[in-house]
Amino acid sequence: MEAASAALRRCLLLIVLVAAATLLPGAKALQCFCHLCTKDNFTCETDGLCFVSVTETTDKVIHNSMCIAEIDLIPRDRPFVCAPSSKTGAVTYCCNQDHCNKIELPTTGPFSEKQSAGLGPVELAAVIAGPVCFVCIALMLMVYICHNRTVIHHRVPNEEDPSLDRPFISEGTTLKDLIYDMTTSGSGSGLPLLVQRTIARTIVLQESIGKGRFGEVWRGKWRGEEVAVKIFSSREERSWFREAEIYQTVMLRHENILGFIAADNKDNGTWTQLWLVSDYHEHGSLFDYLNRYTVTVEGMIKLALSTASGLAHLHMEIVGTQGKPAIAHRDLKSKNILVKKNGTCCIADLGLAVRHDSATDTIDIAPNHRVGTKRYMAPEVLDDSINMKHFESFKRADIYAMGLVFWEIARRCSIGGIHEDYQLPYYDLVPSDPSVEEMRKVVCEQKLRPNIPNRWQSCEALRVMAKIMRECWYANGAARLTALRIKKTLSQLSQQEGIKM
């Protein structure tokens, strides 16, 4: 695309130069015959026109030849000075070639009308419009040719065309096969770029299923398999690159982390789209799921345990040649968690995540103090007391947010037909789109937390969930549970309830 753009710019520059050469007058002055210029060999120079006239009186004929400056040509398309005069009986003629006025004019009107009409509006318009039309046609032709070449080179298939990926991906290969080969080959950092691009460029988009902070999410198909395609606008290239980079972290793949498939930049001939292809989960986000359905005790434990497992894997550092750095999510909420067909969760939207290098005790990007969703921000983020140099601080902020997600899940747990309506955390304390200051006042100054209904005390599973929540919400981040501890507690609860994950 860059090569095509450069070629187009060169073509346009050439056309402009040709047009300028065609339309701009030459630097040399026009030389005219001048009957009064005896000292200059009867020649004058002008930037306007040459003029000649003949006036017939009762006793003689007066001839006049001279230069007319451009400033005196009023109006420019049909100057008054060049028009014949019926009152004086003068016949006039203006022209724009050297010594073109050194002619004999008849004293009759027909010649003057014919000659002066040479600078009439129709002819003048034709002279000007000719080169302009040529330039426009050449320009449109050039744009059309370059556009067609670009579309052919970067075509987006409107129907599935397996022949496009046959050289790289054998017939009958599924996404599951590709991912399995990748995870068992030892790399663990995502599919090869060529395979990613091949997959992305043979996906057929089906329907838009949502919009987020950085773009739109579509359901697509590749070889009959459904995939999710997150499309970023070109101005969000940094966000797209960052999320793709995090997803391809070595050893990140986990059943409770959204399965990454491919990243590609696609040019549709008009603008560039940045694609992030992942597994498709028809239930959508946990936020959507809880709005639509209530859950059983078993369903609640599966949702909570799988979320904790995903976060524990993110937070965990795996040491070794194929190790994985510890990662903090920084924007954990029910809208960034997806529900799978089997009723478990996977964590998505890693665009704001940060990775920790334990060898140097550094974070891989300069973190912003306040990123993420205000409603889910931990107290230390809201009051700006978080220690940005200490990676554990980011993990503890994730734990606080997960406690709020657990509260959303537990409210929808139906026991004996009794359950609460779905609500966002702090729904009764702040507006629908709260500011940082409004959240800080409630969470830090008033030290309020989401209300835990009394009915939860009548169920062991809900009692355990409530205890975990409270230990996630401590104002002191160091006192909060770790993701691994929460995972173990919920695993014990699932065993007690006889739940198979």
From Swiss-Prot:
Cytoplasmic side: 146-501
Chain ranges passing through the membrane: 125-145
InterPro entries, per database record: Activin_recp (IPR000472), GS_dom (IPR003605), Kinase-like_dom_sf (IPR011009), Prot_kinase_dom (IPR000719), Protein_kinase_ATP_BS (IPR017441), Ser/Thr_kinase_AS (IPR008271), Snake_toxin-like_sf (IPR045860), TGFB_receptor (IPR000333)
Residue numbers bearing the Phosphoserine modification: S163, S185, S187, S189
Gene giving rise to this polypeptide: Tgfbr1
Post-translational modification note: Phosphorylated at basal levels in the absence of ligand. Activated upon phosphorylation by TGFBR2, mainly in the GS domain. Phosphorylation in the GS domain abrogates FKBP1A-binding.
Motif (FKBP1A-binding): 191-192
Protein's UniProt name: TGF-beta receptor type-1
Organism: Rattus norvegicus (Rat)
Cofactor(s) this protein requires: Mg(2+); Mn(2+)
Annotated SUPFAM superfamilies: Protein kinase-like (PK-like) (SSF56112), Snake toxin-like (SSF57302)
